[in-house]
Amino acid sequence: MNQKAVILDEQAIRRALTRIAHEMIERNKGMNNCILVGIKTRGIYLAKRLAERIEQIEGNPVTVGEIDITLYRDDLSKKTSNDEPLVKGADIPVDITDQKVILVDDVLYTGRTVRAGMDALVDVGRPSSIQLAVLVDRGHRELPIRADYIGKNIPTSKSEKVMVQLDEVDQNDLVAIYENE
């Protein structure tokens, strides 16, 4: 794959997350009864970064959980090498029933990952609402899903790939578009 363009560098990612944190606080009139839940892998780190920013702004900690949606994906025909579904589940430290859950992911594309995330959340509890925050929305939805908080809208073609790199995983903060060869 050839890198076509850098969309967000470290500073732009930091700014986008700070703006999203402010939008969350404003929309929810504070963050009481709100839980951030990151979708594995990069969504977890984005949720943690958002929680840090919200705590800096509001002065109160925000609960962060994580979910692994592998079992819930409808577009993965084989989950493991022996054809058994891979069950990871959720690690959410509090009951989400009657709480506002903000699902956090890195890239919104077809909507299938988010749908799987919502399925996983409903298996854990019944939140009063589910909101969606993404660092990048690249379009090309296959399901009627829309993000409530978006770091950056990036129009792409289906032949392009948007890659998010985060320091916690990739030792670098960067969002770039790559062209498939």
From Swiss-Prot:
Changing R15Q: No effect on ability to regulate the pyr operon; no effect on uprtase activity. Pfam families: Pribosyltran (PF00156). Keywords: Glycosyltransferase, RNA-binding, Transcription, Transcription regulation, Transcription termination, Transferase. Changing T18A: No effect on ability to regulate the pyr operon only in presence of excess pyrimidines; reduced affinity for RNA; no effect on UPRTase activity. Substrate binds at T41, R42, D105, D106, V107, L108, Y109, T110, G111, R112, T113, R138, V162. It catalyses: UMP + diphosphate = 5-phospho-alpha-D-ribose 1-diphosphate + uracil. Its EC number is 2.4.2.9. Changing R146Q: Reduced ability to regulate the pyr operon, and loss of ability to bind to RNA; no effect on UPRTase activity. Regulates transcriptional attenuation of the pyrimidine nucleotide (pyr) operon by binding in a uridine-dependent manner to specific sites on pyr mRNA. This disrupts an antiterminator hairpin in the RNA and favors formation of a downstream transcription terminator, leading to a reduced expression of downstream genes. Also displays a weak uracil phosphoribosyltransferase activity which is not physiologically significant. Homodimer and homohexamer; in equilibrium. This is Bifunctional protein PyrR. It comes from Bacillus subtilis (strain 168). The gene is pyrR.
